[in-house]
């Protein structure tokens, strides 16, 4: 029986539907759920001070039988106050002054939690391992040398493209500066492992393993007409049009503007009038403004930017799309194409970084910066129904090679050997 302290901070915001619910959030959540279900694991939850309040409610609702290493239940009133302010903060996010006021209140309460919430030292004395799916290993864990420490690292993209995400670079530096020679690192792809070894050769040694991510079990083909009609109506997608689907953050690295421009060219070149593009995902404000500058993309009724999509609506959107596009400039893994394949949707992705590890030969792979290859790929799928069916089937078979059960099984095996 392994006694694992799990840093569940990244999933504490499960109650808030915002752009924090990214691939890393879902990775942390699915690994947590699968570990909690295993009979050979005794799981203990840990939350950072700024996640304590939300964490106690997550535990009570989803993991009532899983103990927590902190005594947060003693401060339920403060937890409720924190959650209320957090809801207000989200609701006024677009208003700079109010956002600052509520943000300051949240920081003050986090400081209070860091001073009053105590760690159960008895549980630490019997713990075998500490697993962090995102954040650095807490300093207090280092005081217990018998606890083996494990981190899951996703990508070094802020170092590959430092100008695009300076905050991400700072975040990774903070993690890597805090690591010790005894830490064990899991990576979601060989590409990510190689990148970290390139940028942090003195930190990453032989204590590593590649353990791929997976799509949630809820992602499966949903061709129920009633469900699709409901989703179309909810996101204002024309009922009389076929659609291409994309899901990503609206950031430059995702190469979305190029993909959209090529789609418009493809439609105009071939005189097509029965298909549109549905672009979903959490928006980076500055990039969304850039997208709006491309008036030709938004003025002809071909592009529908639906923004954040509820989790329960994604299977229908994936499963009923003509094809899915994810021609990113660079990825650490690439979870959306895997979700699309698991829903029986043919995919088009770029042929770089980690994406070949995910898609293999189950989709069309192209150069991310080639307009010609984008247009050719769209034409192949639009004019060849058999190819769409063939790649949809290949995608389903490819997706079966990934599962959260396999991911967690590999993690536990490594922990048992170390």
Model segments located where?
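Carbohydrate transferase catalytic cores enriched for Leloir-type hexosyltransferases
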Residues: 1-418
């Amino acid at each position: 029986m392994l006694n694992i302290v799990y840093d569940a901070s990244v999933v504490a915001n499960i109650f808030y539907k915002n752009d924090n619910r990214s691939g890393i959030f879902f990775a942390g959540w699915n690994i947590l759920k699968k570990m909690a279900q295993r009979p050979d694991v005794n799981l203990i939850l840990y939350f950072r001070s700024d996640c304590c309040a939300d964490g106690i409610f997550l535990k009570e609702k989803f993991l009532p039988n899983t103990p927590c290493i902190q005594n947060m239940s003693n401060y339920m009133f403060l937890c409720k106050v924190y959650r209320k302010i957090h809801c207000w903060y989200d609701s006024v996010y677009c208003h700079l002054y109010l956002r600052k006021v509520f943000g300051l209140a949240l920081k003050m309460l986090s400081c209070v939690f860091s001073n009053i919430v105590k760690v159960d030292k008895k549980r630490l004395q019997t713990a075998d391992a500490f697993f962090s799916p995102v954040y650095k290993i807490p300093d207090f864990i280092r005081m217990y040398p018998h606890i083996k420490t494990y981190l899951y690292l996703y990508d070094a993209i802020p170092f590959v493209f430092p100008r695009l995400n300076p905050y991400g670079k700072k975040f990774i530096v903070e993690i890597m500066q805090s690591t010790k020679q005894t830490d064990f690192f899991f990576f979601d792809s060989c590409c990510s492992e190689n990148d970290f070894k390139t940028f942090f050769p003195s930190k990453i040694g032989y204590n590593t393993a590649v353990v791929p991510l997976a799509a949630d079990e809820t992602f499966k083909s949903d061709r129920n007409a009633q469900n699709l009609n409901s989703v179309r109506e909810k996101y204002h997608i024309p009922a009389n049009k076929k659609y291409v689907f994309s899901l990503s953050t609206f950031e430059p690295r995702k190469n979305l503007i190029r993909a959209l421009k090529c789609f418009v060219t493809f439609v105009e070149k071939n005189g097509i009038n029965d298909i549109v593009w549905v672009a979903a995902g959490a928006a980076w404000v500055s990039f969304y403004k850039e997208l709006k500058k491309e008036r030709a993309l938004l003025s002809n009724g071909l592009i529908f930017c639906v923004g954040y999509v509820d989790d329960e609506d994604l299977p229908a959107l994936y499963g009923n799309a003509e094809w899915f596009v994810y021609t990113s400039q660079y990825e650490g893994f690439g979870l959306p194409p895997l979700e699309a394949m698991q829903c029986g949707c043919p995919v088009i992705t770029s042929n770089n970084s980690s994406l070949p590890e995910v898609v293999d030969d189950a989709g069309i792979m192209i150069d991310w910066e080639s307009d010609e290859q984008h247009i050719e790929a769209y034409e192949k799928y639009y004019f060849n129904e058999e190819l769409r069916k063939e790649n949809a089937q290949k995608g389903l078979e490819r997706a079966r090679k990934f599962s959260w059960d396999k991911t967690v099984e590999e993690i536990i095996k490594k922990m048992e050997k170390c």
